[in-house]
Curated annotation (Swiss-Prot):
It comes from Delia radicum. This is APK peptide. GO terms for biological process: neuropeptide signaling pathway. Keywords: Neuropeptide, Secreted. Expressed in the CNS but not in midgut, ring gland, thoracic perisympathetic organs (tPSO) and abdominal perisympathetic organs (aPSO) (at protein level). One of its GO terms (cellular component) is extracellular region. It is found in: Secreted.
Length: 16
């Protein structure tokens, strides 16, 4: 789903 992809993207781009 779009929401799932958005959440994945935010986590992937989260500051390390």
């Amino acid at each position: 789903s779009v929401a799932a992809l958005a959440a994945q993207g935010l986590l992937y781009n989260a500051p390390k």
